[in-house]
Amino acid sequence: MSTHVPRRVALVTLGCSRNEVDSEELAGRLAAQGWELVADAADADAVLVNTCGFVDAAKKDSIDALLAADDLRAGDGEPAGAGPRAVVAVGCLAERYGNELAASLPEADAVLGFDAYPSIGEHLDAVLGGATVPAHTPRDRRTLLPITPVERGASANVAVHVPGHARGVAGGSAAGSPGRRRLTAGPVAALKISSGCDRRCAFCAIPSFRGSHVSRPADDVLAEAEWLAGEGARELVLVSENSTSYGKDLGDLRALEKLLPQLAAVPGIVRVRTVYLQPAELRPSLLEVLLTTPGLAPYLDLSFQHASPAVLRRMRRFGGSEHFLDLLDRGRGLLPGLGARSNVIVGFPGETEADVDILAEFLEAAELDAVGVFGYSDEEGTEAVSLPGKIAEEEIERRRVQITDLVEQLTATRAQERIGSRVQVLVEEITDGIAAGCAGHQQPDADGSCLVRLPGPAGAAAGPPAGGPSGTGQPGLPGQPGQPGVEVGDLIEARVVATEGVDLVAEFTAVLDRARPSAGRGEAAPSATGARATVLVGRPRADGT
């Protein structure tokens, strides 16, 4: 009889939803290589911290997470289970800084780049065995694949590893796993359709460590969508660095227009949401598909970054207030009431008070549902570092507060305008008769939420009442004979009756589509993501692309 004790690993994820997908790839690989995933870093033999390297605050959070993991480390002579014996950094911060990070942070036993992911278990074994694993040496990943987009596919995941694009990796929790293992059991799942970016925005360092744009083949994306549906996912959030570029390296500039209806038709999936859209590339045919295809979220996530044409030109971007408002008008002509979000940067070198006024006037006219406001800061390796016209940090902060205050007023007003309307809410949690989730115009974990008051005692229970069938897929009213109560994963309709900032408060009206039981669904693999009591100290939404 074997007495082998599986090695235990805790995964800690910081940063954006793309990093969450990468962590689930790492989880799948580790499970396939014999590792046991544990939720509490204190119970692990090794802690793997998937870092974020986007902005200074995210970098600090990543370093703090590594230091917190080191604080849990077992002392010399302590027995197994007394704490982790290895702390390893992966992710964007590790990829971007590599051996520099290793030299400045001896608390990390290893600093590994993306190309180490396929053999991640072997690297952890080596660290636990006392070996010194060479730190990653950073390279500009834009130089590692062919310049011509259509020539990249053959090299991706052969010459270099593209995180989140794994194919045929065993170890998922169901047969047919595409190489990832879910770390959360909720009804919303991120699905990576591409990685990298070919744009050269003056402020952005992401392409240098995420690389050139590489699309996943449509068959891979569809197979993973079907697997996620089998794992209990009901909404797919399509993530990338630039979703509008999807397919250009596959030889089909309209590949996304073809893929989206196929994803919306996957059995069990009730909503597909595309994020990280580049306004300059949002062609009319894609806009029409996004806003008229049944099953796609009524939603546009548009990376405006500013509204002054002069500032945008210095950013190496295109457009301005007039172009952006026209884009929103065309979208609302196709789908009145759509949700729209964006990010903006204030304090970019050369920005004037007049430019700030242009941005404010644009935001007042745009009627956006959510806006992320960032103050500019230099990112090493970017063109903007050397631009003239730098603005003092105090003035950048003043402008950030000014625009943030305006945005909070505008988005709260926008939410109030939805009072009396009916929204479709995907239930993510039920507590004391209140169902919490997101309406179609709200991106999960980004744009606020919707709290739905359920009718009577039937709604207070997460499970069906005695004698009521579950997972029928049929609409109905909770509490009626033969009808179950509302459950997590149900798509329900509700009438908005009040607001709290950007959050909506609504009254239940009907179940539109019930969560279906799945033979492939099981317990999600444990993860230290979100476990503030152990390691994770913060997760900013790092998506300024």
Curated annotation (Swiss-Prot):
Disulfide bonds: none annotated. Residues 416-510 form the TRAM domain. It is an enzyme of class 2 (transferase). Residues 183-414 form the Radical SAM core domain. It catalyses: L-aspartate(89)-[ribosomal protein uS12]-hydrogen + (sulfur carrier)-SH + AH2 + 2 S-adenosyl-L-methionine = 3-methylsulfanyl-L-aspartate(89)-[ribosomal protein uS12]-hydrogen + (sulfur carrier)-H + 5'-deoxyadenosine + L-methionine + A + S-adenosyl-L-homocysteine + 2 H(+). The keyword Hydrolase does not apply. [4Fe-4S] cluster 2 binds at C197, C201, C204. InterPro entries: Elp3/MiaA/NifB-like_rSAM, Methylthiotransferase_CS, Methylthiotransferase_N, Methylthiotransferase_N_sf, NA-bd_OB-fold, Ribosomal_uS12_MeSTrfase_RimO, rSAM, rSAM_horseshoe. Its EC number is 2.8.4.4. Its cofactor is [4Fe-4S] cluster. [4Fe-4S] cluster 1 binds at C16, C52, C92. The keyword S-adenosyl-L-methionine applies. Binds 2 [4Fe-4S] clusters. One cluster is coordinated with 3 cysteines and an exchangeable S-adenosyl-L-methionine. Gene3D superfamilies: Methylthiotransferase, N-terminal domain (3.40.50.12160), Nucleic acid-binding proteins (2.40.50.140), tm_1862 like domain (3.80.30.20). Residues 454-486, 516-545 are annotated as: Disordered. Residues 455-464 have a biased composition (Low complexity). Belongs to the methylthiotransferase family. RimO subfamily. HAMAP family: MTTase_RimO. This is Ribosomal protein uS12 methylthiotransferase RimO. It comes from Frankia alni (strain DSM 45986 / CECT 9034 / ACN14a). The lineage of its organism: Bacteria, Bacillati, Actinomycetota, Actinomycetes, Frankiales.
